[in-house]
């Protein structure tokens, strides 16, 4: 059984027991989170596709940890001008474990 849901402006394909990183959610570690924007639920041959959402669809997950991703360097360089600008960025994330898929 798997499902596709939307969180943080992105779509994720998940199954029960899977751990994934989402954009930072404002919840405590160990708390339970419910995602209502379920786009598709598939259980073997039985597939429910939402228009745009699956009615009564819900994904339950447990927050494992919060953290920051790897550093991404941004470099701006102007040729022949002796000008260079460098900046770094680390994106916050929330790691969740999917505990249930309801349709």
UniProtKB/Swiss-Prot annotation:
**PROSITE patterns the UniProt entry points to:** RIBOSOMAL_L21 (PS01169)
Its Gene Ontology molecular function terms?
rRNA binding; structural constituent of ribosome
Would you name any one GO CC term?
ribosome
Recite the UniProt keywords alphabetically.
Ribonucleoprotein, Ribosomal protein, RNA-binding, rRNA-binding
Function according to Swiss-Prot or TrEMBL: This protein binds to 23S rRNA in the presence of protein L20.
Q: Which family does it belong to?
A: Belongs to the bacterial ribosomal protein bL21 family.
- What protein name is recorded for this chain? Large ribosomal subunit protein bL21
Q: Please name the source species.
A: Vibrio parahaemolyticus serotype O3:K6 (strain RIMD 2210633)
Q: What's the source species' lineage?
A: Bacteria, Pseudomonadati, Pseudomonadota, Gammaproteobacteria, Vibrionales
């Amino acid at each position: 059984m798997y499902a596709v849901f939307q969180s943080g402006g992105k779509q994720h394909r998940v199954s029960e027991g899977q751990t994934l990183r989402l954009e930072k959610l404002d919840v405590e570690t160990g708390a339970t989170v419910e995602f209502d924007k379920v786009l598709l639920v598939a259980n073997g041959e039985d597939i429910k596709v939402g228009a745009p959402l699956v009615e009564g669809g819900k994904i339950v997950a447990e927050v494992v940890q919060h953290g920051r991703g790897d550093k991404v360097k941004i470099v701006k360089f102007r040729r022949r001008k002796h000008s260079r600008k460098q900046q770094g960025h680390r994106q916050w994330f929330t790691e969740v474990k999917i505990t249930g898929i309801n349709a």
